[in-house]
Amino acid sequence: MNDEVLNMKKVIILGASFLQVPLIKTAKQLGYYTIVADMNPNAEGFEFADKKYVVSTIDTEALLKVAELEKPDGIVTAATDMPMRSIAYIGEKLNLNTISYDTAIKATDKFKMREALNKENVAIPKYFLVNNKEDYKKALKNIKGKKIIKPVDSSGSRGIFLLENEKDIDKAYKHATENSRNRTILVEEYMQGEEVSVETLTSKGETKVVAITDKITTGAPHFIENAHKIQSTKDKDIKTKISQLAIAANKALNIETGLSLIHISEPTRPLY
């Protein structure tokens, strides 16, 4: 390693898929020595990295060993959820500027997230944690009308199912559990209405809303995202309430630093 490289600041980037390529390129443009980790040895982002490690982005202990060896100035990711646990864990171990491990767990576990939001009186739909078929049947009886069935530990709309009738009860359970690493799901009341996504930036505990976008999905039963319209066309009053709710959600999860993406439904009032 030459003197120029030795004098460069190092950043570990978790993920080398096409989603992380812009992050890798930008880090290099900013003068960072990029150390990229991904379990896929053929991940396209490796082409742009200064150094690569073929390691899963959720293998926390293996990544900690990489970080202890490389001694980075920072560790980041983009467009993915679960690696935040690894980032927070390593951040606490090496005293890097990351969210706390407790916050990372709450932000990537939908049940723990709802518990944290509920504790701080942030508006959320009625929900039940389900670990087995018996819990599932009980939860269904406790929520009237349509229900949303979803994994607690998935993202990108994977595993979501809108349950509208009894004939799909088993189908919804199977779809959600198969998309959960620990086969744990949530049963929630369905909030029918338009959805928005809120992009926020938090620094030293102060959150600013960067953008509110109108969310376009495939609709029922899986609600897979197709596109976003930026900025939202909703009126100023609604945007203000959306911003307030997004900031409250960040505070409830104790997010002190970083970017957040919050999905909000506008069934009637209040927002959820």
Name each model-derived stretch:
Residues 2-103, 134:
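ATP-binding N-terminal substructure of ATP-dependent carboxylate-amine bond-forming enzymes
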Residues 160-260:
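Internal nucleotide-binding/catalytic subdomain
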Residues 12-13, 74-77, 125-126, 162, ...:
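Short catalytic-loop micro-motif centered on adjacent basic/acidic residues
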Residues 263-272:
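Single conserved hydrophobic/aromatic residue that forms the stacking wall/gate
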Residues 92-159:
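A conserved helix-loop-beta module that forms one wall/lid of the active-site cleft
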